[in-house]
Amino acid sequence: MAVDVTEYHLSVIKSPPGWEVGVYAAGALALLGIAAVSLWKLWTSGSFPSPSPFPNYDYRYLQQKYGEAYVEAKLKRVPPWNDQRTTTRGPPSRKGSLSIEDTFESISELGPLELMGRELDLAPYGTLRKSQSADSLNSISSVSNTFGQDFTLGQVEVSMDYDGASHTLHVAVLQGKDLLEREEATFESCFMRVSLLPDEQIVGISRIQRNAYSIFFDEKFSVPLDPTALEEKSLRFSVFGIDEDERNVSTGVVELKLSVLDLPLQPFSGWLYLQDQNKAADAVGEILLSLSYLPTAERLTVVVVKAKNLIWTNEKSTADPFVKVYLLQDGRKMSKKKTAVKRDDPNPVFNEAMIFSVPAIVLQDLSLRVTVAESSSDGRGDNVGHVIIGPGVSGMGTTHWNQMLATLRRPVSMWHPVRRN
């Protein structure tokens, strides 16, 4: 009997029934199908549409990436910054970061603009408002071959810190590059002077450096300074070239407000972009701007807070100012928004938020041009002056942009001189 059973098993193995082969084949095909579907889902879940070159008005791209409900959601959502406090002054907040659920709940209770106003700590300036969209990207007053460009005369690397115990400001001039590149003159050597504004107090003068466009200064200066003076003083870094007649000629200057650096809390170190002294002095007012970028929502927020000491065009005694903000990509105008008009006010408070959809992959190709203009009856308006902010510009424009990128999700506010057009 045992032999018969063994022979039966051997016969089944050598020549199995047809129905059993079919069951095995169907099971194998089912497993292969499940594996193929799983791999396909993994593949499609990791793929995204290529970035749109027009992220602010190509909603097909946004719908493809975020779903059909994104257009409605983008009108209701607000960036959930991690820090509860968002001013650039003072230590970082110790409160926990806002969760998405908490943010949406706050939006439902307060409304998105009121919540943003609380995050930016703009209560002293009134209610935060939404800016107006501007349809025209080719207005007569803004068309120019150099619309999104700002020129630099070299860079200097500096560092500074404040000793609260001795009330002393320490300034170090580390190095410079491309300092003597001027077409109209040739210089054999140069030096740098550091002064404290507005009193023009000399902080220090570097040694003369010869025959070098890239220079290592490595010099340190100190000046007594009361803590209250940090809010009103500025440092000016001036580079002078020495020509063949031994004359000192200004080849570039940059000014840095101490109030934006938080020196009592942490040292500052960075590259500053030099400008022509004539352009730096040709200011027609100042404007306070706040920038923040939320990478998860790919959203750039610009808040036009206020302006002061505006000088009107054509020696006017009065005018009605407003602000236009252009988003530029590689110098091309991609989007434009503007504030409301303020009537007869050289120190207007705008307090308006402008939100741009910006994929992170194109962030380094972007810049902002902020133009202060005068409203007119024909609707065209005369430009008072402008500010350019971005990675490829100079002065405070690049400092503000880099600080925004260094503190993602946290708005950074800075004053900018408004340069005459």
UniProtKB/Swiss-Prot annotation:
Residues 1-18 are vesicular. Synaptic vesicle phosphoprotein that enhances spontaneous neurotransmitter release but does not effect induced neurotransmitter release. Unlike other synaptotagmins, it does not bind Ca(2+) or phospholipids. Essential for mossy-fiber long-term potentiation in the hippocampus. The modification Phosphoserine is found at residues 97, 99, 214. The keyword Nucleus does not apply. It comes from Mus musculus (Mouse). Keywords: Cytoplasmic vesicle, Membrane, Phosphoprotein, Repeat, Synapse, Transmembrane, Transmembrane helix. It is a single-pass membrane protein. Phosphorylation of Ser-97 is required for mossy-fiber long-term potentiation. This is Synaptotagmin-12. Its main location: membrane.
